[in-house]
């Protein structure tokens, strides 16, 4: 028997006896081949280690970036690399150790709150059609926050936005959001948006907190949960009055499009004109019918009756037209005044800047000579240094 034959037989034996196994261990010596995209690493515990390989097509399905020191669960088959005789695992899937425990906790809490009725539609508060004042509960240094501001300005610049900085990752997430939520709920907002961009299950775990869920349910203000991406679900999503797929989608779900509103007003004007023309046409037809009827019936009584009917119809039509015109005029004046005031506000504030150092917002007086920092406005960011 040759070495090659031995290795091939050993490979066949291992793969037939261990076609699918699940192994828990810590990643070390992780590398990604730049040309093939395959992953190679060692899985170890306190007493032993084994080489592992994961091919690119499989690695693309992993929802996190592996790194040395991570404890993971590998599913795959045991094999031998024939050219060298190295014993290894060909990984078919990888998940973080403890992920199954998190899923169990998530399912248990979801069932508990559902049984208590916290997810029931009857308790969901409707979102306002034309919100004038809303609150963001998010990280003010995040891309999600900037995206929400941009979409809000594009769709409905009349809305006033207050932002509350909260932790969106880590053990302080729930308490931070609860505190901000209770504060915002007392300030007469039309809606409160809890938002965070995408991340791993562990990154988003703070939004699966029972106390946070109960705080959202108890809020008097309508609450939108916009946590992660479309495939991410949190307990906050289920208990909130509305779940948006992403923070950007939350703005599109909540705010009307000003261009659509203007088109609706134009359509209403056309409807009113057509309605008035229709009324006049009906009156004209009625007069023609009356004229024919007068030829065969009492002239005096018919004239009197049609004069009364005509005056009554004229009065109703006049009152209706005045009502509709007054209604449209009031709506147009209101929107015009709001638009002017908000446009002035955005014009005044567009040149305001924020100062951040090492990713955190700081005060100008706290900077020292030699400090590097970033100056950011709504439109641009620049790096600077104190001389």
Swiss-Prot record:
Extract the GO molecular function terms from the UniProt entry. exodeoxyribonuclease VII activity; nucleic acid binding
Q: Which reaction does it catalyse?
A: Exonucleolytic cleavage in either 5'- to 3'- or 3'- to 5'-direction to yield nucleoside 5'-phosphates
One BP annotation, GO: DNA catabolic process
Q: What is its main location?
A: cytoplasm
Pfam families per UniProt: Exonuc_VII_L, tRNA_anti_2
Stated EC number for the protein is 3.1.11.6
Q: Which family is it part of?
A: Belongs to the XseA family.
Record's subunit section: Heterooligomer composed of large and small subunits.
Its biological purpose is as follows: Bidirectionally degrades single-stranded DNA into large acid-insoluble oligonucleotides, which are then degraded further into small acid-soluble oligonucleotides.
PANTHER family xref list: EXODEOXYRIBONUCLEASE 7 LARGE SUBUNIT
Official protein name in the record: Exodeoxyribonuclease 7 large subunit
User: What lineage is on file?
Assistant: Bacteria, Pseudomonadati, Campylobacterota, Epsilonproteobacteria, Campylobacterales
